[in-house]
Amino acid sequence: MQFAVRILKFADGLPNRPSGRTVANQVARSGTSVAANYRAALRAQSRADFINKITTVLEEADETAFWIELTELANLLPAKRLAALHTEAEELTKIFNATRMTARNHKS
């Protein structure tokens, strides 16, 4: 949930011009989706359901990292303001990938 809050604050800080608004909308959507879909994954009805939902979480975390990278490449914000958030998005991507792999390999 805290990642989603940080993403919303990041989105609010983007420039109010077409490129900034585009990135703000996309990163807010994908970044908050990480938290919402993770919550749904925790309530999965089966292992297959959990794997499907955690895959969505993984994809949204990776997409969020993409939008943060694009923000830097497009010079919408200084790189030093993005470093911690980008690192967190990458770490979450790795965590959710490992979670998915464990769930896939777990024998019931």
Residue ranges and their predicted role:
Residues 1-108:
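Short, C-terminally biased terminal segments at protein or domain edges
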